[in-house]
Amino acid sequence: MLEHALISGAYLFSIGIYGLITSRNMVRALMCLELILNAVNVNLVTFSNYFDSRQVKGDIFSIFVTAIAAAEAAIGLAIALAIYRNRKSTRIDQFNLSKW
């Protein structure tokens, strides 16, 4: 069970990193960042259940990471919406925010 959860967490993390590196769209990059944070949550819960199933430290950390991910998504989408209103594009390679 431990191996399967860690392998799935590693796959999620790898897909998120690959998408974050290769994506040119800001919304897609935010989605890949969320995928990375979900992979971290999978690993936290897996290690928490494997090492000491009586304590819920990994589960509590997972809740905190989820809350931070929700705040990051809200702020990131608000920034993407503001940039889209000004630039009419969400492509990362077209951003030149020094001349806003």
Curated annotation (Swiss-Prot):
InterPro entries: NADH_UbQ_OxRdtase_chain4L/K, NUOK/Mnh_C1-like
Top-level taxon of the source organism: Eukaryota
Reactions listed under catalytic activity: a plastoquinone + NADH + (n+1) H(+)(in) = a plastoquinol + NAD(+) + n H(+)(out); a plastoquinone + NADPH + (n+1) H(+)(in) = a plastoquinol + NADP(+) + n H(+)(out)
Localisation per UniProt entry: Plastid, Chloroplast thylakoid membrane
Major localization class: plastid
A molecular function (GO) term: quinone binding
Keyword Plastid carried by entry: yes
Chain segments annotated as transmembrane: 1-21, 29-49, 63-83
The name this protein goes by in its record: NAD(P)H-quinone oxidoreductase subunit 4L, chloroplastic
